[in-house]
Structure formats: C-alpha cells, structure tokens
Amino acid sequence: MDRLKLIKNLKNSMTKIFFFMSLLSANIYAKPNIILIFVDDLGYCDSEIYGCEEIKTPNIKKLADSGVSFSAGYVTSPVCSPSRASLLTGKYQQRFGHEFLPDAVPQKKAGLPIDQITIADKLQDLGYVTGLVGKWHLGTRDEYHPLNRGFDYFYGLLTEGSDYLDPTNPDARIIYRKWRGEYPPRINSSSELWSGRDSDSIFENKEKLVEERYLTDAFTSKATSFISEHKSEPFFLYLPYTAPHGPLQTTQYYYDKYKSVKNESQRIYAAMIDALDSGIGVIIDTLEQHDLINDTLIFLISDNGGGVADYGSNFPFRLGKHTLFEGGVRVPFVM
C-alpha cells in the first residue's frame, strides 16, 4: 500500500469514528456500551483471526466471526506508550511530544501531556461511567493518573510491565532470560514481591495492592466486576491487558494445554495467549448473562506488532515490534 493510499484510509477511518461520536453527542441513538480491549504485543499471526492455527483462540475468533476483522489495521507507533497515547487521544503522538517511550527520560517526569483530552474525558462528558483495567503506561505522577484523565475507576499498573504472578508459587511456569536482564527476584512470598515495588505495583484506584492471582486472570475478574456493577448504565471499559508482553510467565493450567510445543519459551508464550483468549471469553459470557451483548461495541486491537524475540509471529509480514516494517505496525484489529 503506497503512502497516499494509507493516509486516505486513515482519514476515512477517523471520519467514521468522529461521525460515530457525533451521533452519541446528539443522542440520536441510545448510548451503546463500549469495551476497548488493547492487547500488548500480539502478533498478526498469534491468533486465529487471520487463519493462523498454531495457538487456539476460539473467543478472539468468535469476535472476528461475529463482527468485522480488518486485514489492514495499523497503529501509529511500533512501541507501547506512543501507540497508547495516540489511541486515547485520536492524534498522532508526535503532535504533542509523546513519540518515544517514557522510560527514555526520568520516569516520574514523563507522561501524556495534561492538555491532551482523552476518549475517556469525552465519554465522561456524554454520561458514560468509565473504567480502566490493565496497563496505563502514560505517566506515573498524580496529574497523569487515570483518575485524572477521564476514568472513574482504575485497576492495574501505571508502568510498562510487571510480573504476572509470584515466581515462588509452585504453579508458576517462568522463563528468565538473562540477555534481557530478567532474573528471579529474591523473595519468599507474594507480599514481598509487591511491597518492594513503586510505580510498577498493582493499584486499585490509588491504593497499592498485593495481587495473588495470575495477572491476566485478575484483569479479567476486575473487568467483569466493572461490567456487572454498571450493567444498568452506559459504560466505557478500556481493557489494556499486558499479555502476551514479557516476561514469559504462565500457570500450570495454561501451560498443560501446549504439551506438543517442545520449545519451552514458545510453550509459555502460547499459554499466555491462551489465558488472554480465555479472559475475552469470560468478558463475552458476562455480557451475555446481563443481556448486554447486543448493546455493546467491542474493539480488540494490539498496541503494536508481536515481539520477534518473544516468539511473536507477524507472518506474512516483515519483522515486528520496534520496527516500522509491516510486522511492527500492522496489527490484529477486530470490532
């Protein structure tokens, strides 16, 4: 696809989004619930959306089969935080100085500029209750906190990543890669794991927590609680799972599903995506139980291409995360 055609497609997509928002503002139609699932480092061929079958993702495929799957879905950046900044503001991140990962400068000073309006701000103004469950990665100072950026509720982490579970748990299946600076923490319990952290802790609103559950499962549980609590009012749920972003960590339950995969790292990576898909299935089931499935818009997008070093597959495209080749910015996209 040449540059002019790509720009035209992006313009058409933005026109449709703003038309939809204008309908909400005009109250022409009843306000649908909106769930935006923003997964982390999911490659183009890491699910069954586009015919790849190495990792079974029946729930993601169900979303695609019952809706629309985009074969040419692009994000504006091949890395986490800039892509998130663009998604939540509807602007190219370069226009407000957020084109780099905030980790490249002193972490506490970096974040989504406070003069930028988010989709959560807009939907709050339209009468939506707004929730964020998952990864923020747009600043750790109080002025950048999700509760100050349009969200009524927050559960998750403020930074780029976290352990998924206590590595001393006998149920944990973990690969530590020294070349990536990953080493087992010197701890004896979950409370030690979480209490020794700062911004990469798990928070509920602004309270630091000790989370005993596998993190993907915990995000799913909190998301379903949010849906159930607000089933009688229009809600916007931003659900940025951390999976399958590293570190490579899973539980025995998901690990056992991939006994045929001989490479240990690939096996854990597949299990992490399985947990993600299972969580999406629980979200769908919850909507069906509350008779909300036909009143809810569900979007599933990856923040960038799969990490090749983490066994992400962007087939048939070249390379992946951190690059501007197709594999880095052409992502799974379903609605």
Question: In which residue ranges do the predicted regions lie?
Answer:
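Sec-dependent signal peptide recognition
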Residues: K11-F20
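Cationic, low-complexity basic patches in intrinsically disordered or flexible, solvent-exposed regions
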Residues: L6
